[in-house]
């Protein structure tokens, strides 16, 4: 059996895996256990009451967290004309059409989000094999294919998170950094849960939000008592 590291022993001793923690208690515990030499992200896993094998029960979308994610986001926009100027004014780092596609084909991908206006999809469509595996392919379901590229850039810069359930019906995303105030992390979490509730498939039956867990980049998961969250009502 592998020997536990000192960090793992501390986590094992501090975290009760059978307990559902009040959100404030959970955040305090995560902060205490976040001892990495960098500012760890606070990640959330939400178990949904869906059948992920059925396409009409899959959950996908995006929402802007009220306090952002604490990450600096670099944005590439495929568009032209007035939209190109609007995207630049909104703060996009990369704006173009075929010229931007050529950069990507050369392996130059210094961005975190790709946005496209509908007329640019003829160019973006050629990049599926490069952007798709990295989760960067623009999609109207998450607001990254839109005629209003400036708004999409603003959302990305403001702390928009995209979510999509995995094959087990679990949503994984981030809600901030461990150095955020507890209230900000709670409000970001509640904002995400509100968005997930709005995205509930009509075919999903029974309890929808089954379990909510928080963790830091290098830490263990802490199960959250949903009764302490304003956003949750199954």
UniProtKB/Swiss-Prot annotation:
PROSITE patterns: RIBOSOMAL_L1 (PS01199). Binds directly to 23S rRNA. The L1 stalk is quite mobile in the ribosome, and is involved in E site tRNA release. Protein L1 is also a translational repressor protein, it controls the translation of the L11 operon by binding to its mRNA. The lineage of its organism: Bacteria, Pseudomonadati, Pseudomonadota, Gammaproteobacteria, Enterobacterales. It comes from the Bacteria. Belongs to the universal ribosomal protein uL1 family. The gene is rplA. NCBIfam families: rplA_bact (TIGR01169). InterPro entries: Ribosom_uL1_bac-type (IPR005878), Ribosomal_uL1 (IPR002143), Ribosomal_uL1-like (IPR023674), Ribosomal_uL1/biogenesis (IPR028364), Ribosomal_uL1_3-a/b-sand (IPR016095), Ribosomal_uL1_CS (IPR023673). It holds the Pfam family Ribosomal_L1. GO terms for molecular function: rRNA binding; structural constituent of ribosome; tRNA binding. GO terms for cellular component: cytosolic large ribosomal subunit. Keywords: Repressor, Ribonucleoprotein, Ribosomal protein, RNA-binding, rRNA-binding, Translation regulation, tRNA-binding. Gene3D superfamilies: 3.30.190.20, 3.40.50.790. GO terms for biological process: regulation of translation; translation. This is Large ribosomal subunit protein uL1. PANTHER family: 54S RIBOSOMAL PROTEIN L1, MITOCHONDRIAL, LARGE RIBOSOMAL SUBUNIT PROTEIN UL1M. The keyword rRNA-binding applies. Part of the 50S ribosomal subunit.
């Amino acid at each position: 059996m592998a020997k536990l590291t000192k960090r793992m022993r501390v986590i094992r001793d501090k975290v009760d895996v059978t307990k559902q923690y009040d959100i404030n208690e959970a955040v305090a515990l995560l902060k205490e256990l976040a001892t990495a030499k960098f500012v760890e992200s606070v990640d959330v896993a939400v178990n949904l009451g869906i059948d992920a094998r059925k396409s009409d029960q899959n959950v996908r979308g995006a929402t802007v967290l009220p306090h952002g994610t604490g990450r600096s986001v670099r944005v590439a926009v495929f568009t032209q004309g007035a939209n190109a100027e609007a995207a630049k004014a909104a703060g996009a780092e990369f704006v173009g059409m075929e010229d931007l596609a050529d950069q990507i084909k050369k392996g130059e991908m210094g961005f975190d989000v790709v946005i496209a206006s509908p007329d640019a999809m003829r160019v973006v469509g050629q990049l599926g094999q490069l952007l798709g595996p990295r989760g960067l392919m623009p999609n109207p379901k998450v607001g990254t294919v839109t005629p209003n590229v400036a708004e999409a850039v603003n959302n990305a810069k403001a702390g928009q998170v995209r979510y999509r359930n995995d094959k087990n019906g679990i949503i994984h995303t981030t809600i901030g950094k461990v150095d955020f105030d507890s209230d900000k992390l709670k409000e970001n979490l509640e904002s995400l849960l509100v968005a997930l509730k709005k995205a509930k498939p009509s075919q999903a039956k029974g309890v929808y939000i089954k379990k909510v867990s928080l963790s830091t980049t290098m830490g263990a998961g802490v199960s959250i008592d949903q009764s302490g969250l304003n956003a949750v009502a199954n």
